[in-house]
Amino acid sequence: MLDAFSRVVVNSDAKAAYVGGSDLQALKSFIADGNKRLDAVNSIVSNASCMVSDAVSGMICENPGLISPGGNCYTNRRMAACLRDGEIILRYVSYALLAGDASVLEDRCLNGLKETYIALGVPTNSSIRAVSIMKAQAVAFITNTATERKMSFAAGDCTSLASEVASYFDRVGAAIS
């Protein structure tokens, strides 16, 4: 996993060049938006349990067969596994948002996820739906448009962070499908 700083150093080193110009400007911007980024990550991790349980509940409401005998969320053990997977995905999305880099998400969460779900017989459309619900929740928290819970954020526009976190959830959905 490379954070924004490591990425700039590695790229400059590969070119045998000093860090400068647009790379320095990008780092200045990253630092300037640091408090907003930390607030965005905090809004996700502070609401993680609710986000995951709401996403799984929404997925089940749309597909009640999941909790019927033979369904993938039938029995407490399977439901717990579903909730655990949602927590893991959300945790790695928050890591990626904190670092400003998707490599930790790709390497430690998404690599082999589809194959694992296929082997376990997990319905991909339901998993993708739960991920899309978490995406909507994360964007709402970051843009402070969640109706039930408002978070305090550093001053400024957070739409770029909302777009960034949405792209991480899109990567998860693409990896599962």
From Swiss-Prot:
Xref: Gene3D superfamilies: Phycocyanins
Family: Belongs to the phycobiliprotein family.
Source species of the chain: Porphyridium purpureum (Red alga)
UniProt gene name: cpeB
Main location: plastid
Organismal lineage: Eukaryota, Rhodophyta, Bangiophyceae, Porphyridiales, Porphyridiaceae
Binding-site residues, (2R,3E)-phycoerythrobilin 1: 82
Positions that bind phycourobilin: 50, 61
Name of the protein this chain belongs to: B-phycoerythrin beta chain
Compartment(s) of residence: Plastid, Chloroplast thylakoid membrane
Biological processes, Gene Ontology terms: photosynthesis
Keywords for this protein: Antenna complex, Bile pigment, Chloroplast, Chromophore, Electron transport, Membrane, Methylation, Photosynthesis, Phycobilisome, Plastid, Thylakoid, Transport
Modified residues (N4-methylasparagine): 72
Superkingdom per UniProt: Eukaryota
